Design a protein with these regions (language model features):
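Terminal alpha-helical segments
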Residues: 1-93
């Protein structure tokens, strides 16, 4: 039986998010805007998954929906931010 390591899982999500954010930044500098947005979305998704794991002590759900992940995070997120997350989710397509 495999034991779920919360700390290791959070570290994985955050390190992966940092890598994706760096990739997105490079794409932005080279004016490849759609791809930069895609990687920015991935970074946000992974940060939210790390927060979900931290707050629930369970694996993050298998989803790309930023609004769904935000709702699972147990954070009090202003509606305007949730609206932005919904818009960002469109760039994962």
């Amino acid at each position: 039986m495999m034991i779920f390591d919360v700390t290791k899982t959070i570290k994985y999500w955050l390190e992966s998010a940092a890598y994706d954010l760096d990739t997105g930044r490079s794409l932005l500098e080279s004016k490849r805007f759609p791809y930069a947005l895609f990687f920015a979305h991935l970074a946000l998704e992974k940060i939210l998954k790390a927060i979900v794991v931290k707050s629930t002590k369970e694996h993050a759900p298998f989803t790309h929906s930023l609004t769904f992940l935000a709702s699972k995070s147990k954070m009090d997120i202003p509606e305007s931010i949730v609206d932005n997350l919904a818009e960002y989710t469109e760039f994962h397509i």
